Regions:
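Solvent-exposed loop/turn and edge beta-strand elements of beta-rich ligand-binding domains
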Residues: 1-180
Length: 180
């Protein structure tokens, strides 16, 4: 009979909280995130989907560096405004947090006014109207944020812009999926 010394080490785990925010009226549920460890291996449960409140809380993780990447579907109407991917340090006994903010991917309409000889014409006024169904139309209104029927172009008045000295104008920050 021989004595043997055995050492047990208690490892205290940490957790990772991913917080999803969407500018405007977008849903917080169902956004997909891949989480990998320092070796590039996906952790159990990855990819994760955000809940109704936009949060994900992972199971216990070993302390160390993890990479969190938002997985946006191809052709998504949203764009990630945060760094993507992001690296975060999980510390034992603590919950590391990382946030991702998305915004609607807006569009723009550029107009260049020229005459028959291709000379650019300044001072021409254009009205831009929008509709959700193609039946009821209304002028775009000034808005600094992306909203249905909004436009952030400087000088917009009653849905109208006037071409500059180069005969150009841009209706910008237009909400996608509408008729213009």
């Amino acid at each position: 009979h021989q004595d043997t010394e055995i050492t047990f080490t208690n490892v205290q785990y940490g957790k990772l909280k991913i917080q999803k925010t969407v500018e405007g009226d977008g849903s917080l549920a169902g956004w997909q995130f891949r989480v990998t460890d320092a070796h590039g291996t996906e952790i159990d449960g990855s990819p994760f989907a955000s809940g109704d409140d936009g949060t994900i809380l992972t199971a216990n993780l070993l302390p160390g560096e993890y990479t969190v990447e938002e997985l946006l579907p191809e052709g998504s109407l949203y764009q990630c405004k945060s760094d993507n991917p992001q690296t975060v340090a999980v510390i034992q006994g603590q919950t590391a947090e990382v946030s991702f903010v998305n915004a609607i991917r807006t569009g723009a309409i550029t107009i260049e006014k020229v005459d028959l000889e291709e000379n650019r014409l300044a001072g021409a006024t254009f009205l831009l109207e929008w509709s959700e169904d193609g039946a009821l139309w209304q002028p775009v209104a000034f808005s600094e944020t992306a909203v249905r029927g909004g436009c952030s172009s400087t000088g917009l008045a009653d849905g109208q812009l006037t071409t500059d000295e180069n005969g150009s104008l841009v209706f910008s920050n237009l909400y996608p999926g509408l008729h213009y």
